A protein has these predicted regions:
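N-terminal cap/lid segment of alpha/beta-hydrolase-fold proteins
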Residues: 1-31
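Short beta-strand/loop motif that positions the catalytic acidic residue
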Residues: 185-186, 192-194, 198
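Catalytic histidine-centered segment of alpha/beta-hydrolase-like enzymes
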Residues: 225-235
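Catalytic nucleophile-loop/oxyanion-hole region of alpha/beta-hydrolase
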Residues: 44, 53, 69-102
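Hydrolase active-site cap/lid region
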Residues: 119-170, 188
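Conserved alpha/beta-hydrolase "acid-adjacent" motif
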Residues: 199-205
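Active-site glycine-rich loops that stabilize anionic/oxyanionic intermediates
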Residues: 34, 41-45, 196
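Short amphipathic alpha-helix adjacent to the substrate-entry channel of hydrolases
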Residues: 48-65
Length: 250
């Protein structure tokens, strides 16, 4: 038996530049429009934050988890440069959902999804609050990986090649810097959470992100947490939900 909206979640598809993107919309109890979080996974997206979606739903939030073009069942070729457009398409989809309060849409991004949240929010005023954890705000460091490492860590899961991916990384690193985007988010609330044991994105980058952001930025370091907060998920969930409740619903 497949879950339906009455059971708290439903499958969704929506269009982005002619490509059909797939996702799951977790729906809080009640028919009235609810505040909603857009969840952005990283690259390739092994950690999909399903636990956070359930926690948000249990606390009265809707949550949409979707997949960018070219990964995890979404159509098209994977391209870092088009991910912000996919995020905008997801916002368009949410804004048309009757059980979504279009005036209370937030975004939560992890790793590369944190970068996507930052660069999209800089030009997308419909995002009322922005939260990131383990954010790869500056993707330049990834460009130094070998082609074999890129294939092993990323492209074997994606509809692209190591060579194409390297070109995308270089272009994004030069033209779409998440650290630079952070200042444009002000005065909207921004939450930056980072683990001190993150081996993919050094905590120094998160501290620089805090410096670049405006006074509405809330910065939290979690001692011993790794890139995916593997052993700190409950703490992460409570932190994010509590902050969102304050930032969006007051």
């Amino acid at each position: 038996m497949w879950a339906t909206e009455d059971e708290g979640l439903t499958g969704v598809t929506f269009d982005s530049d002619g490509h059909s993107l797939v996702g799951v919309l977790y729906l809080a109890r009640g028919e009235e429009p609810k505040p909603t979080v857009l969840l952005l996974h990283g690259c390739p997206g092994l950690e999909k934050n399903l636990d956070l979606a359930v926690r948000l739903r249990d606390r009265g939030w809707n949550a949409l988890l979707f997949h960018y073009r070219g990964c995890w069942g979404s159509a098209g070729r994977y391209d870092l440069r088009t991910i912000p457009r996919d995020v905008t398409a997801a916002i368009d989809h949410l804004a048309g959902c009757p059980r979504v309060d279009a005036g209370r849409i937030a975004v939560l991004g992890h790793s590369m999804g944190g970068w996507a949240a930052l660069v999209t929010a800089a030009v997308e005023p419909r995002l009322q609050a922005i939260a990131v954890y383990g954010a790869a705000a500056r993707l330049g460091a990834v460009t130094r990986l070998s082609p074999d490492r890129i294939e092993h860590e990323f492209t074997r899961f994606l509809a692209t090649t190591p060579e194409e991916f390297a070109v995308q990384l270089n272009m994004v690193a030069e033209r779409m810097d998440g650290l630079a985007a952070a200042a444009a988010i002000e005065p909207r609330p921004l939450l930056v959470v980072h683990g001190t044991a993150d081996r993919w994105v050094p905590v120094a980058q998160a501290r620089e992100l805090r410096e670049r952001a405006g006074p509405s930025c809330c910065y939290v370091e979690v001692e011993g947490a790794d890139h995916a907060f593997s052993w700190h998920r409950a703490e992460l969930g409570d932190l994010i939900v509590g902050w969102l409740n304050e930032a969006v619903t007051g």
